[in-house]
Amino acid sequence: MCKFCPNPSRRHVIAGIGTLSLGAALVGPSRLAMAASLKKPSFTPDEALSKLKAGNAKYLSSSEECEKDLAKHRKEEESSQAPWATILTCSDSRVVPELIFGGLNLGEIFVCRNAGNIADDDMLGTIEYGAEHLGSSLVVVMGHQHCGAVTAACNAVQKGEQPGGFIGKLVGAITPAAEVMMGKDGDFVANTVLENARRNAETTLTASEVVKDLVTVGELKVIYAT
């Protein structure tokens, strides 16, 4: 087994997946026409999701995928890229989407990251670019176990431990999810991780006109997972 590969038993199984939907009435006809003219994805949303699920199962059974020689693929992808999925995930250094989804090659997924996988303006712009210009047909907002940003938000709600500086602003974006999960059955942090992923998937779906349009015409799906 590759010594650089994370132990798959630690977390990297996709434990829960949720899908969000959008009514066509929310999007005007001019926007729908624009969406129809955008770059077509190489996979349908459901095909992309199935590919990620299969890759995750492959990773859990054979993490040696990280031994792949990426030099060849790096050369192949120098001039262009065509990712079929966009992943919004946490900056945690233990979370490596390319490995979690089966040792994917360069150019297959478009990854955007910040602490706590928050769909802020920068991340929404990145998601739009992946969907509109690169042809990504699936957006996954992915939380993870033992997330430090989510734990900090839970501590802020439960213990009043509010960090300062820009970290405080980041934690503040996750606090509403922690407030909703406070007192629920199960692990407080784990519940908040899932709720935070759900909320940011919902933000992605409702705040971005580009995402709305592509979802409405069936060329994009938005899901959340942990």
Residue ranges and their predicted role:
Residues S91-L104, E108-D122:
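Active-site cofactor/substrate anionic-group-binding motifs, chiefly glycine-
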Residues M1-P8:
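N-terminal secretory signal peptides
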Residues L88-C90, R113, V140-H144, I223-T226:
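Short beta-strand segments
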Residues I14-G18, S37-S80, G107, G116-G125, ...:
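Divalent-metal-activated hydrolytic enzyme cores
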Residues S9-A24:
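N-terminal export leaders
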Residues K72-A85, C90-V95, N105:
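Glycine-rich, flexible N-terminal cofactor/catalytic loop recognition
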